[in-house]
């Protein structure tokens, strides 16, 4: 799976280090390896996009290292592969030694895993499941400003799934903890890999059941009901949060217009 890059190799290049991505000119590099000074480097084939290979290269470039969010507006399939590259680069960087016996580890040749030659333990990339939910009450949707997003963006509620918890239980707990309300009629919508960090977003829609909004000030700045045709600043297109909001708006339009 891992090999030395040759002069004629071409494709999409996910050059990553410490969860950063090399974006010369603000774009994901595409073309022949020689044009990006990649010949002789180690590369891992992580997929294909539009008939061309996608390669992950673990390397820190002095300039143009940015965030994966900068390519969020590209095609979802390419964004997903770039996210895979970042997560794999971070996985290999953080698993050089075995967590059980402390001996050095090496990469598997048959799968994305790290192996310990001493105790035979096998490690796989960490994936953190999260829930994200759009909550509707009549013609309105619950939107909140998160403390970590002080840019005026209002979005739906989300959170990590805890150990020993189902996705449904996670939705009920997160909604109650952050907003103080209860929900009903939970429906699964879609999922999205989201490497900020190593998350798998599982998206739901739900209906308001009971309770008054009581904001968890540790997590949220504000939370309120917004009529579907009078919404504040929203997350960018391409995010699963935006998808949930747009789906809720479409349902409201169909019912109230």
Swiss-Prot record:
UniProt short sequence motif Nudix box, positions renumbered to this chain: 159-180
- A GO CC term? cytosol
Q: Which residues bind Zn(2+)?
A: 98, 101, 116, 119
What residues bind a divalent metal cation 2, as annotated? 174
> Which reaction equation describes what this protein catalyses?
a 5'-end NAD(+)-phospho-ribonucleoside in mRNA + H2O = a 5'-end phospho-adenosine-phospho-ribonucleoside in mRNA + beta-nicotinamide D-ribonucleotide + 2 H(+); NAD(+) + H2O = beta-nicotinamide D-ribonucleotide + AMP + 2 H(+); NADH + H2O = reduced beta-nicotinamide D-ribonucleotide + AMP + 2 H(+)
Instruction: Provide the binding site for a divalent metal cation 3.
Output: 174, 178, 219
Annotated Nudix hydrolase domain ranges read 125-248
Q: Name one GO biological process term.
A: NAD catabolic process
Q: What InterPro entries does its record include? A: NAD-cap_RNA_hydrolase_NudC (IPR050241), NudC-like_C (IPR049734), NUDIX_hydrolase-like_dom_sf (IPR015797), NUDIX_hydrolase_CS (IPR020084), NUDIX_hydrolase_dom (IPR000086), RNA_Hydrolase_NudC (IPR022925), Znr_NADH_PPase (IPR015376)
Q: What class of enzyme is it?
A: hydrolase
Keywords from the UniProt entry? Hydrolase, Magnesium, Manganese, Metal-binding, NAD, Zinc
Q: Where on this chain does substrate bind?
A: 69, 111, 124, 192-199, 241
Named cofactor requirement(s): Mg(2+); Mn(2+); Zn(2+)
Positions contributing to a divalent metal cation 1 binding: 158, 178, 219
Write the Enzyme Commission number(s) for this entry: 3.6.1.-, 3.6.1.22
Record-level Gene Ontology MF annotations: magnesium ion binding; manganese ion binding; NAD+ diphosphatase activity; NADH pyrophosphatase activity; RNA NAD-cap (NMN-forming) hydrolase activity; zinc ion binding
Q: How is the cofactor bound?
A: Divalent metal cations. Mg(2+) or Mn(2+).
Q: What does this protein do?
A: mRNA decapping enzyme that specifically removes the nicotinamide adenine dinucleotide (NAD) cap from a subset of mRNAs by hydrolyzing the diphosphate linkage to produce nicotinamide mononucleotide (NMN) and 5' monophosphate mRNA. The NAD-cap is present at the 5'-end of some mRNAs and stabilizes RNA against 5'-processing. Has preference for mRNAs with a 5'-end purine. Catalyzes the hydrolysis of a broad range of dinucleotide pyrophosphates.
Into which family does the record put it? Belongs to the Nudix hydrolase family. NudC subfamily.
How is this protein organized at the quaternary level?
Homodimer.
Q: What is this protein called?
A: NAD-capped RNA hydrolase NudC
* Gene giving rise to this polypeptide: nudC
């Amino acid at each position: 799976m891992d090999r030395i890059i040759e002069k004629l190799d071409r494709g999409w290049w996910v050059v990553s280090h410490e969860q950063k991505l090399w974006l010369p000119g603000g774009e994901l590099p595409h073309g022949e390896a020689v044009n990006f000074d990649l010949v002789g480097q180690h590369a891992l084939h992580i997929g294909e996009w539009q008939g061309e290979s996608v390669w992950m290269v673990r390397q820190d470039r002095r300039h143009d290292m940015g965030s994966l969010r900068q390519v969020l507006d590209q095609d979802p399939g390419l964004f997903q592969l770039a996210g895979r590259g970042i997560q794999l680069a971070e996985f290999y960087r953080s698993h050089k030694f075995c967590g059980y016996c402390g001996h050095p580890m090496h990469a598997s040749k048959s799968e994305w895993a790290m192996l310990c030659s001493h105790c035979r333990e096998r490690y796989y990339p960490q994936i953190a499941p999260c829930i994200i939910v759009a909550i509707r009450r009549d013609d309105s949707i619950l939107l909140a400003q998160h403390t970590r997003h002080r840019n005026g963006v209002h979005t739906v509620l989300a959170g990590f799934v805890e150990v020993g918890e189902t996705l449904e239980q996670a939705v009920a707990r997160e909604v109650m903890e952050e907003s103080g309300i209860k929900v009903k009629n939970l429906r699964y919508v879609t999922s999205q890999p989201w490497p900020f960090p190593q998350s798998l977003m599982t998206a739901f829609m739900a209906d308001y059941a009971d309770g008054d909004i009581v904001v968890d000030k540790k997590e949220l700045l504000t939370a309120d009901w917004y009529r579907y045709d009078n919404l504040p600043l929203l997350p960018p297109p391409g995010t699963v949060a935006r998808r949930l909001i747009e789906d809720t708006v479409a349902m409201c339009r169909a019912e109230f217009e």
